[in-house]
């Protein structure tokens, strides 16, 4: 099964060695792209509405010719949900998340709502702080 890494905005304090996992696709979600660069990982695509990405990070993304998908701030889905939607045949992939820690409560509820109500929950792992949270369908 192919492995997908999604890096969310918000804090990211995981010490998981991501270099030990072979990812076929790496997605930076808005400001979560910084967590990838901090770990010397280059995303294949960055998507979001630019509400949590600073100018220097955006310039770095552009200078590296990384595919960038820009969304309007006013939209019906969160950037995280759009990143999940971008995955072709998600039920056939292992999806790993980093970031999304702490922050505003509504963001955490949104993450939990998405991963427990969609087909992504079949094979989703969230490296949350020092924990590994597995989401699997029964």
Residue ranges of model-derived segments:
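N-terminal beta-strand-loop-alpha-helix module at the start
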Residues: 1-60
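Basic phosphate/pyrophosphate-binding loop/patch that engages nucleotide-derived ligands
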Residues: 117-122
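Short Gly/Thr/Asp-enriched flexible loops that form oxyanion-binding sites at enzyme active sites
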Residues: 106-116
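Short phosphate-binding loop-to-helix
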Residues: 68-90
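Short glycine-rich or small-residue beta-strand-to-loop segments that form or flank ligand, phosphate
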Residues: 69, 95-100
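A glycine-rich helix N-cap at a beta->alpha junction
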Residues: 64-72, 123-125
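Long, charged alpha-helical interface segments
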Residues: 131, 136-138
